[in-house]
């Protein structure tokens, strides 16, 4: 087994590195050393996650529980720990300092270490897993007991990364891109083989183990599996949609629905539904499960579509209404009657044992149509999104206007010859929408309100994502456009994510919540680490169907800024 100390030393070394290439080399060195059985665990750990994102498993450890565990392990009061965190701004550095002080005061610590076996990566994982599975009476005590064991068994440096890992935020800037390249480097396999294996498994832990054990052949043997969701292909806004359609020499035009993305896995009579964030939402949508059972005539399939909340006339309701269905855990049947769903299918990635993602869209479309049966009457609950392949710009505009008149967002413009690229955003899927510019940004800081809103968070620091460094870069603050109800909802969502100091009522927020923000323009600014600032930002809606890594990137911020200059 590989010691957790070796993992912590790698993290410490990476923290001191600014070069992506050097970081990749350090991760590759670690992966080479780790036993193949532990490789999936180490791979996820280095990306600040305990469980694979697709698994649905939640660690469920908040800051208060972590502080209590550290308090019991060290003898320091929770209040003193919170005070120290306000100074350091980091639970990891705080744990390091506390355990250093404790060890210094333990005369017999050397003999303690001799008796105590080294923590392994597997031991840390098992303790986290036991804590995550605790429920019901006594569950908090069990969680604390397992974390306390880890702190008592660790060196100060190990405690630093155990505490950060408990909050799934190592702060070392290692994301999927770095790990993907590190796997290729560590096991001398082509990066495109690693990339494709990741696309079909959605699990770099599985990919790393396969590359180590069997090289290229093992990577090529990996494929899509039912009930292991893959990332959804993404679209981007085009600055010149007409030029893009001409470049495609005919594009596939589909309505763009203002609903919630859903990935459907069917295996016999069993149906599992996953949200855009790959959360299992099957129990919240029993009516959708029955619709799939009735109308999808395939033994096994993985489908992509959009679920739209509709009124009694089949007209689309607001986006927030469908999210109420996805979030629902109780009185699900009652909610289904109050907010009926229409499912619009537009792609298929797997059919009866065959992976389809490498096929062109036109062929996937035929496969989709062959396995979905619905009449005109059925189309109120399920349909294959109507598609027209054309290069006629006037016809595209006509379809676009029809979509808007029907209450939808606009149209999708797709390359008919494109493969399905899980998790990728590019020019093969473009969207045409009305011209109000918005960005999906992550909350990284906040400030309490004033007056009657003194008990609510009133201002939010928002950031874009840098996929090259896995960091979030601030682009501004937003405090307008929110109702009291929305302020209450956001305060509840963010209350468990607060960390760091509270000077002037300002505090840091762990990057978990995504907001859609409108703005007048983007300006260059030295005030934020992104180098940009939003002018007159205002809140539009919460995007809790998106993960932080799906937020708009620093590259998109730069593109929008450049496009503004061209319009001047």
UniProtKB/Swiss-Prot annotation:
Q: Which residues bind ATP?
A: 254, 261, 276, 306, 346, 425, 431
Keywords for this entry? ATP-binding, Cell cycle, Cell division, DNA damage, DNA recombination, DNA repair, DNA replication, Ligase, Magnesium, Metal-binding, Nucleotide-binding
Q: Which reaction does it catalyse?
A: ATP + (deoxyribonucleotide)n-3'-hydroxyl + 5'-phospho-(deoxyribonucleotide)m = (deoxyribonucleotide)n+m + AMP + diphosphate
Q: Look up the EC number in the record and give it.
A: 6.5.1.1
User: Where is the catalytic site?
Assistant: 256 (n6-amp-lysine intermediate)
**Known PROSITE patterns for this protein?**
DNA_LIGASE_A1 (PS00697), DNA_LIGASE_A3 (PS50160)
Biological process terms in GO annotation: cell division; DNA biosynthetic process; DNA recombination; DNA repair; lagging strand elongation
Q: Which cofactor does it need?
A: Mg(2+)
Which top class of enzyme applies to this chain? Answer: ligase
InterPro entries given for it? ATP-dep_DNA_ligase, DNA_ligae_ATP-dep_bac/arc, DNA_ligase_ATP-dep, DNA_ligase_ATP-dep_C, DNA_ligase_ATP-dep_cent, DNA_ligase_ATP-dep_CS, DNA_ligase_ATP-dep_N, DNA_ligase_N_sf
Protein origin, superkingdom: Archaea
Pfam families given for it? DNA_ligase_A_C, DNA_ligase_A_M, DNA_ligase_A_N
What GO molecular-function term can you cite, just one? Answer: metal ion binding
| Parts of the chain that traverse the membrane | none
Q: Name the coiled-coil region(s).
A: none
> CDD domains from the xrefs?
Adenylation_DNA_ligase_Arch_LigB, OBF_DNA_ligase_Arch_LigB
Q: Which family would the database say this protein is a member of?
A: Belongs to the ATP-dependent DNA ligase family.
As for what it does, the entry says: DNA ligase that seals nicks in double-stranded DNA during DNA replication, DNA recombination and DNA repair.
Q: Which PANTHER family match?
A: DNA LIGASE (PTHR45674:SF7), DNA LIGASE 1/3 FAMILY MEMBER (PTHR45674)
- NCBIfam families, sorted: dnl1 (TIGR00574)
The protein, known as = DNA ligase 2
Q: Where does this protein come from, organism-wise?
A: Methanosarcina acetivorans (strain ATCC 35395 / DSM 2834 / JCM 12185 / C2A)
Which gene is this protein's source? lig2
């Amino acid at each position: 087994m590989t010691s957790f100390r070796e993992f912590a030393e790698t993290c410490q070394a990476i923290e001191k590195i600014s070069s992506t290439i050097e970081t990749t080399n350090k991760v590759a060195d670690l992966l080479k050393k780790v036993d193949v059985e532990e490789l999936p665990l180490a791979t996820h750990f280095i990306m600040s996650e305990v469980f694979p994102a697709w698994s649905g498993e939640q660690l469920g450890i908040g800051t208060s529980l972590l502080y209590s565990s550290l308090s019991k392990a060290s003898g320091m009061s929770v209040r003193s720990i919170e005070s120290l965190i306000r100074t350091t701004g980091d639970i990891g550095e705080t744990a390091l300092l506390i355990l250093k002080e404790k060890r210094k005061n333990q005369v017999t610590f050397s003999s303690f270490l001799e008796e105590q076996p080294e923590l392994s990566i597997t031991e840390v994982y098992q303790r986290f897993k036991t804590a995550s599975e605790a429920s019901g009476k006594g569950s908090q005590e069990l969680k604390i007991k397992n974390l306390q064991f880890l702190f008592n068994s660790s060196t100060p440096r190990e405690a630093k990364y155990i505490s950060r890992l408990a909050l799934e935020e190592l702060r070392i800037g290692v994301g999927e891109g770095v790990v993907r390249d590190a796997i290729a480097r560590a096991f001398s396999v082509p990066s495109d083989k690693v990339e494709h294996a990741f696309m079909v498994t959605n699990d770099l832990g599985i990919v790393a183990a396969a590359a180590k054990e069997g090289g290229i052949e093992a990577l090529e043997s990996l494929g899509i599996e039912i009930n292991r969701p893959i990332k959804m292909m993404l679209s981007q806004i085009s600055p010149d949609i007409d030029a893009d359609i001409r470049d495609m020499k005919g594009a596939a035009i589909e309505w763009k629905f203002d609903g919630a993305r859903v990935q459907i896995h069917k295996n016999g009579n069993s149906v599992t539904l996953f949200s855009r964030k790959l959360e299992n939402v099957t129990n919240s949508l029993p009516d959708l499960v029955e619709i799939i059972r009735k109308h999808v005539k395939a033994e096994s399939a993985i489908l992509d579509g959009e679920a739209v909340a509709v009124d009694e006339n089949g007209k689309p309701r607001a986006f927030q209404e469908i999210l109420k269905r996805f979030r629902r855990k109780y009185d699900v049947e009652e909610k289904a009657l109050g907010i009926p769903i229409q499912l619009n299918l537009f792609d298929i990635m797997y059919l009866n044992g065959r992976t389809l993602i490498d096929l062109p869209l036109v062929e996937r479309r035929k496969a989709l149509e062959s396995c979905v049966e619905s009449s005109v009457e059925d189309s109120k609950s399920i349909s294959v999104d109507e598609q027209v392949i054309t290069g006629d710009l006037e016809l595209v505009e006509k379809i676009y206007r029809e979509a808007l008149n029907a209450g939808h967002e606009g149209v999708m413009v797709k390359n008919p010859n494109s493969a399905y690229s899980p998790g990728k955003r590019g020019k093969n899927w473009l969207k045409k929408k009305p011209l109000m510019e918005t960005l999906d940004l992550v909350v990284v800081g906040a400030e309490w309100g004033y007056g009657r809103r003194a008990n609510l968070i009133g201002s939010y620091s928002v950031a874009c994502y840098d996929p090259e460094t896995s960091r979030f870069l601030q682009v501004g603050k937003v405090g307008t456009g929110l109702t009291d109800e929305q302020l209450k909802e956001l305060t509840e969502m963010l209350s468990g994510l607060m960390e760091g100091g509270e000077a002037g009522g300002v505090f840091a927020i762990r990057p978990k919540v995504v907001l859609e923000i409108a703005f007048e323009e983007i300006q260059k600014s030295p005030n934020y680490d992104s180098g940009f600032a939003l002018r007159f930002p205002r809140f539009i809606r919460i995007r809790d169907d998106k993960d932080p890594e799906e937020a708009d990137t620093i590259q998109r911020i730069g593109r929008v800024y450049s496009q503004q200059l061209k319009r001047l």
